[in-house]
């Protein structure tokens, strides 16, 4: 077996054993780009060897999405397969694991009318809500694992022939996920321990807010009452550990939906449903993004933020060191799974229940500052020029990051 096949086998095994931490007899519901069919078959093989009772896959096709946006009647863009998402949500609540294979062409929908793209995305977000709630509530174990989609490879390595670009992207994936190491599972155990140490430190400090200061950014993010930091392996409501993201370098918590003030600029592009959004700037008052601009893709971003009132508020704040393995590649991946783990970031939209003590829901969740929305969109703000302080309620502060690196 050559090195590529060996690393691909290791990645698939990581997804099932470390990402999902699959339980014997558990069902798996997978979503994947249609180009990933061979990788999905390998994932299914690993899942069945670990005792999966049923592996069901739902494929997505960006070419079909593009044809729909170009040819379907306008009123058809308000439709989405609610029946499918309701079924997925029911399966998750009944114990099925959720496996997402990521990887897509970040430019697949470029050139299409932004109002059409936004309309379809809004309809899909509404229909997907039951499934999103089950995921953000951690009712079951779930993970995201990357696939080197040719369109994605072309975006990351635009000067290379496609075959070489795909090979280089796979190498980056194997490195970032630790699949290229001799014992990837042991490497992940050590990595999870390191992330959990940072989580324990931050949870012990009980900061009132975080202050981000860097070029174009002077932002104070208030933290939700009874907030909890998370990172690495996370427990579901039933107590089963899973690693939601392969790779991951972040520790994250819930902002207070009404206590975000200041200005912030993105440090990396955002791939938003087949459209690249670059140069994002936002100004917050009392937690609400009163001004949002982008140098490219602004209309698609605006339409997403018009989904509901919570879409212009923050649901996540994450700290990521600028000297981690993904950041040190020097690559811009045009993929949230990778770029969010190369830089500190914030997210518009839905907050995670796991980031609040006791995992409250409904009015209790909102009362403590948890944000609710149909969307959850991470965008990157960290860099080697970013400083981050933890602020206490009395105004004193503790340096957490200097020039993008941990100092604690």
UniProtKB/Swiss-Prot annotation:
Any coiled-coil regions, as ranges: none
Gene Ontology MF term list: aminopeptidase activity; metal ion binding; metallopeptidase activity
Cofactor(s) named in the record: Co(2+); Zn(2+); Mg(2+)
Chain sites annotated for binding a divalent metal cation 2: 316, 340, 376, 378
SUPFAM superfamilies given in the database record: Thermophilic metalloprotease-like
Binding-site residues for a divalent metal cation 1, renumbered to this chain: 250, 316, 340, 345
UniProt-recorded name of the protein: Aminopeptidase T
Entry's cofactor comment: Binds 2 divalent metal cations per subunit. Can use cobalt, zinc, and possibly also magnesium ions.
Subunit structure: Homodimer.
Enzyme Commission no: 3.4.11.-
Gene3D superfamilies: Thermophilic metalloprotease (M29) (3.40.1830.10)
One Pfam family named in its UniProt record: Peptidase_M29
InterPro entries with a match to the protein in the record: M29_Exopeptidase, M29_N-terminal, Peptidase_M29
S-S pairs: none
GO BP terms in the entry: proteolysis
UniProt organism field: Thermus thermophilus (strain ATCC 27634 / DSM 579 / HB8)
Family: Belongs to the peptidase M29 family.
Keywords: Aminopeptidase, Cobalt, Hydrolase, Metal-binding, Metalloprotease, Protease, Zinc
Role played: Metal-dependent exopeptidase.
């Amino acid at each position: 077996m050559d090195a590529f096949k060996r690393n691909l086998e290791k990645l698939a095994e990581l997804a099932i054993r470390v990402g999902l931490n699959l339980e014997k007899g558990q069902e798996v519901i997978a979503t994947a780009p249609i180009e990933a069919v061979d990788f999905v078959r390998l994932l299914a093989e690993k899942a069945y060897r670990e005792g999966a009772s049923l592996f069901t896959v739902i494929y997505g096709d960006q070419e079909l999405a593009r044809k729909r946006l170009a040819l379907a009647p306008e009123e058809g863009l308000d439709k989405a397969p609610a029946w499918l998402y309701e079924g997925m949500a029911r399966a998750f609540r009944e114990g099925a694991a959720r496996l997402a294979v990521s990887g897509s062409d970040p430019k697949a929908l470029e050139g299409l009318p932004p109002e059409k793209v936004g309309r379809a995305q809004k309809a899909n977000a509404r229909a997907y809500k039951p499934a999103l709630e089950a995921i953000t509530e951690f009712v079951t174990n779930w993970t995201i694992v990357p696939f080197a989609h040719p369109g994605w490879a072309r975006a990351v390595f635009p000067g290379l022939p496609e075959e070489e670009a795909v090979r280089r992207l796979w190498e980056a994936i194997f490195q970032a996920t630790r699949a290229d190491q001799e014992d990837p599972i042991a490497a992940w155990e050590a990595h999870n321990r390191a992330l959990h140490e940072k989580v324990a430190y931050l949870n012990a400090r009980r900061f009132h807010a975080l202050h981000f200061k860097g070029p174009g950014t002077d932002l104070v993010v208030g933290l939700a009452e009874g907030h909890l930091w998370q990172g690495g392996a996370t427990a579901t409501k039933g107590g089963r550990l899973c690693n939601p993201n392969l790779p991951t370098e972040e520790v994250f918590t819930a902002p207070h939906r009404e206590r975000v003030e200041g200005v912030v600029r993105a440090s990396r592009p955002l791939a938003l449903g087949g459209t690249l959004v670059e140069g994002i700037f936002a100004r917050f008052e009392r937690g609400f993004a009163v001004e949002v601009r982008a140098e490219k893709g602004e209309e698609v971003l605006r339409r997403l933020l018009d989904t509901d009132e919570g879409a212009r508020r923050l649901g996540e704040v994450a700290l990521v060191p600028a000297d981690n393995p993904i950041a040190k590649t020097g690559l811009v991946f045009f993929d949230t799974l990778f770029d969010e783990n190369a830089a500190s970031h914030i997210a518009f939209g839905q907050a995670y229940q796991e980031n609040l003590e006791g995992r409250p829901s409904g009015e209790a969740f909102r009362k403590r500052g948890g944000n609710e929305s149909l969307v959850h969109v991470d965008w990157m703000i960290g860099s080697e020029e970013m400083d981050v302080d933890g602020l206490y309620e009395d105004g004193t502060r503790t340096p957490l990051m200097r020039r993008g690196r941990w100092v604690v």
